[in-house]
Amino acid sequence: DRLLEAKAAFLHSSFITVGGEGILFAGNKQAGKSTQAALWNKYRGALTVNGDRAVIRLEGGGLRAYGSAFCGSSGIALDESAPVKAIVLLGQASENTVTPVPAPEAFRELLGKMTYDTSVQSSVEAAAAIAAEAVARVPVVRLVCTPDERSVEALEAALWRK
């Protein structure tokens, strides 16, 4: 797969930029990816670059996200990119909490949300290498949250130490 050869892969996530940095909201269907992107747009003026499948790529010593044509039901697919500030694994709750995800768990979660051919060993190995390096380069946090501004405030405080 040419994408994997370029140290890049699709990640099932909503991708926003705020202050020139990217945040990837990753989760299963109905986890709140589009909701979080919309909340960040409304309350922090973030730009939603992609609503369903961003491309992540290992570049230099960091991780960069790119918009893709695969936007799901959001219809949002912009040709933009940004260095990744964090990957946020989503869950729903009545209170907002942000916790760091240990590397082994972050690796499993990330690999499970990437798109690659599981029947081809070299694709599996390449995707695993990208996932391992991605979690070593950028913070992966779990945000369990309410669908309102308080979730934005909680994540912002955790990522920017406000």
Regions found by a protein language model. Give the residues of each.
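N-terminal pre-Walker A segment at the start of P-loop NTPase domains
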Residues: 1-10
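Post-Walker A alpha-helix
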Residues: 36-37
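Glycine-rich, often acidic-flanked micro-motifs
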Residues: 12-14, 18-28, 41-162
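Conserved glycine(s) of the Walker
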Residues: 31-33
